[in-house]
A protein has these predicted regions:
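A short, basic N-terminal segment
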Residues: 1-77, 159, 170-171, 407-411, ...
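The catalytic "switch" region of P-loop NTPases
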Residues: 2-32, 214-374
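Phosphate/oxyanion-binding active-site loops and adjacent basic polyanion-contact surfaces
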Residues: 45-60, 88-89, 117-125, 242-250, ...
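Alpha-helical scaffold elements adjacent to nucleotide-binding pockets in ATP/GTP-utilizing enzyme cores
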Residues: 59, 63, 92-99, 120-131, ...
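P-loop NTPase nucleotide-binding core
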Residues: 72-263
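Short secondary-structure boundary/capping segments
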Residues: 125-128, 320-325, 408
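Conserved AAA+ ATPase small/helical "lid" subdomain
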Residues: 142-187, 333-412
Length: 422
């Protein structure tokens, strides 16, 4: 079935085929971008092909399930993702985040290792708070942030809380510090909250209030920033934690409270580990980061850390680590090597997903052949290339078609040479 495209056909496009018109239309959405930004990680991916890097996806899902079912040991999990540039590591991080949040399986923090720091616990903490303040699931109409969801779930757990008390906690403009102290005491009387940080529970209860001023001070307190007396007034005079060791303690306390509230993992998606080599003292930075994540997962059993980096970088730097740290990184969850070269079948799925998105955005029905205007024979020319190279080649092809105003055969001469064997 064919329908009229939402965008008017470009007068320079000579084909009467509506799908070719869409493909060649310079005003149509871009579908072959090979770059994923940190902001993209927080949105659904209409182009995701779940069969690509299937082993890594299955491993990740198994680790998440083991944490939820309480089948891990007394410490958290570390999963290494190794691959060459352009193999799809950041794309996979995005898929992991969407997998977890679309199924309400936990809370993810995403970060790239691009900043110099002497305290990686603080770096992780700042990125965690940034992540918790983002919308939890952008695939639904719910606009709640992760932090708002957690505070609401914590309030739901308060024993014998009346609806009137709940509404007062949400919207009353007076001082609720005494009430929050009482609610926190009720919570810590429950077995699941008995070991949680009492002051952190109170902070999460303050976060439930419908007051942006309170929300701002909660975020500052969670980041272990110093607070003025005026700031502390909004959060029940809570004492800020500003010692050098406090960020790591805060990370562990937040993970523990998340586990008590919803019995789900706190997941750190740490990307582009190889960027540490661009900083001063790169070997020392690498060691500090590994020390931080191993200590965190040792102390917080519901944490999962996914490390993605270039395989060459990791192989060159792993020898700088003591055996005890290597064992934590590589056991019991063995590193996953991401295959960078795509098969013809995978390439066809990549193209199908992107063409389908294009046609749906322009109000077109689906063509009989979901690869149209491509043929599988044309796409075979891109076999054994990296995902990034394939998308760049397709983007250049579409741009030429737009300039010509017609569909051009997929060009064999435009294929970059395949990467050397590993």
């Amino acid at each position: 079935m064919t329908t009229t495209a939402i965008l008017p056909p470009d007068s320079s496009i000579t084909s009467a085929d509506p799908w070719i018109q869409a493909y060649c239309d310079p005003k149509a959405p871009e579908i072959f971008s090979s770059i994923i930004t940190p902001a993209d990680v927080w949105s659904p991916d209409p182009f995701d092909v779940e069969t690509i890097h299937q082993e890594a996806r299955e491993r990740f899902a198994q680790v998440v399930d083991r944490v939820i079912q309480g089948r891990l040991s007394s410490r958290g999990a570390i999963q290494l993702l190794l691959g060459e540039s352009g193999s799809g590591k950041t794309h996979l991080m995005r898929a992991f985040r969407n997998y977890v949040h679309s199924r309400n399986l936990g809370y993810c923090a995403y970060m790239q290792m691009t900043s110099q720091t002497n305290n990686y616990a603080r770096y992780l903490l700042n990125n965690l708070v940034d992540s918790l303040e983002k919308r939890y699931d952008t695939s639904t109409h719910d606009t709640s942030t992760a932090l708002a969801r957690l505070s609401e779930a914590l309030v739901d757990a308060i024993p014998s809380l009346t609806e009137e008390e709940r509404q007062d906690l949400k919207s009353w403009d007076g001082d609720l510090s005494d009430a929050i102290v009482q609610y926190a005491d009720r919570l810590t009387a429950l077995d699941r909250f008995h070991r949680c940080d009492l002051e952190l529970i109170r902070i999460f209860l303050h976060r439930y209030r419908d007051d942006y001023r309170v929300h701002n001070r909660v975020a500052m307190w969670l980041r272990c920033q110093n607070l003025t007396d005026q700031d502390r007034r909004f959060i029940g005079q809570a004492t800020p934690h500003v010692d050098e060791a406090d960020p790591l303690r805060m990370l562990c306390a937040i993970a523990q409270l998340i586990g008590a509230i919803q019995r789900v993992p706190l997941i750190f998606l740490i990307d582009q580990l190889e960027d540490l080599q661009n900083l001063e003292q790169p070997v020392e930075q690498f060691r500090r980061l590994v020390d931080t994540i191993t200590t965190l997962t040792d102390q917080a059993p519901n944490t999962i850390v996914v490390l993605a980096c270039l395989e060459d970088y990791y192989v060159a730097h792993r020898q700088q680590l003591p055996k005890s740290k290597l064992d934590r990184l590589e056991n019991p969850f063995q590193s996953v090597r991401l295959m960078s070269q795509r098969s013809v079948e995978e390439i066809c799925e990549i193209v199908k997903r992107r063409l389908r998105y294009l046609y749906e955005e322009l109000g077109l029905g689906h063509p009989h052949d979901p690869l149209h205007p491509f043929t599988s024979q044309e796409l075979e020319k891109a076999a054994k290339l990296r995902t990034r190279d394939i998308l760049d080649q397709l983007r250049r092809h579409q741009e030429r078609c737009r300039q010509a105003g017609r569909y051009l055969p997929f060009p064999p001469g435009d294929t970059p040479p395949p990467p050397p064997p590993p």
